[in-house]
């Protein structure tokens, strides 16, 4: 198995994500407000993208359901007409 080594990039960026506390210990930095805003914006954008897809899926589902209901109605009407014709002729 390959052992992970600290590359210069990891070493150079490692200090960005940590900060030294008053006692000298390194703690994770809190996210910057702009990055939090950006994440919120990304989530809103994704929600706006997902919402029309959900609407399309619902419309597709409804269009699938409606032909079934229509075909059932058509079948019932045809049978009723055949039945009533048969009743009238006999």
Curated annotation (Swiss-Prot):
Keywords: Apoptosis, Host cytoplasm, Host membrane, Host mitochondrion, Host mitochondrion inner membrane, Host nucleus, Host-virus interaction, Inhibition of host innate immune response by virus, Inhibition of host MAVS by virus, Inhibition of host RLR pathway by virus, Membrane, Modulation of host cell apoptosis by virus, Viral immunoevasion. It is found in: Host mitochondrion inner membrane; Host nucleus; Host cytoplasm, Host cytosol. GO terms for biological process: symbiont-mediated perturbation of host apoptosis; symbiont-mediated suppression of host cytoplasmic pattern recognition receptor signaling pathway via inhibition of MAVS activity. It holds the Pfam family PB1-F2. InterPro entries: Flu_proapoptotic_PB1-F2. One of its GO terms (cellular component) is host cell cytosol. Residues 65-87 are annotated as: Mitochondrial targeting sequence. Its main location: host cell. Disulfide bonds: none annotated. The record marks 66 as: Low pathogenicity. Belongs to the influenza viruses PB1-F2 family. Is not encoded in all strains, and seems to be dispensable for replication. Oligomer. Interacts with human SLC25A6/ANT3 and VDAC1. Interacts with host MAVS. Plays an important role in promoting lung pathology in both primary viral infection and secondary bacterial infection. Promotes alteration of mitochondrial morphology, dissipation of mitochondrial membrane potential, and cell death. Alternatively, inhibits the production of interferon in the infected cell at the level of host mitochondrial antiviral signaling MAVS. Its level of expression differs greatly depending on which cell type is infected, in a manner that is independent of the levels of expression of other viral proteins. Monocytic cells are more affected than epithelial cells. This is Protein PB1-F2. It comes from Influenza A virus (strain A/USA:Phila/1935 H1N1). The gene is PB1.
